[in-house]
Amino acid sequence: MHYAPIIIHMHVNTHFHFFLGDTHYRNQFETSKSSGALSHSARTGWEDRMFDRKHHNATGFERVKYGTMNFVNDPKGVRACAGYGQSYFLLKPHVRDRCTITDMDSSSPSATLGTFRFIFHLLMKLSDAEVNSAF
């Protein structure tokens, strides 16, 4: 787990140009673009539920940015996230300390939260099939 990177999957042909002229990774509230659900109200509901409404009135820049933890260091990234793009950015290791991690898609009402330093309760929820499918 010590080397598990946080990555951001993306479609190079449609999203890479957003990264070229910017100094920050922007969320859909800032760009109005998404490879997932684009509904602001749906995403606001998920984030309100996950974070007890702490981001409800936040500016777009202050809102959640989404990525995934490549806990098995698969060179193809996280296979369950391939729908967001086959390519990905590898974030610097110190970013992990500022991340909230879920055991499943964050839109799920039953998603459990953790952090990189407090993650074992999430790993214990993985089935053998989920772990094996990562290899």
Question: Model regions: which residues?
Answer:
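Active-site-proximal loop/hinge segments that shape catalytic or ion-binding/gating pockets
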Residues: 2-12, 27-58, 75, 85-135
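Long, low-complexity, Ser/Thr/Gly/Pro-rich intrinsically disordered segments that act as flexible linkers
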Residues: 7, 17-19
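A short acidic (Asp/Glu
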Residues: 19-21, 76-80, 100-102
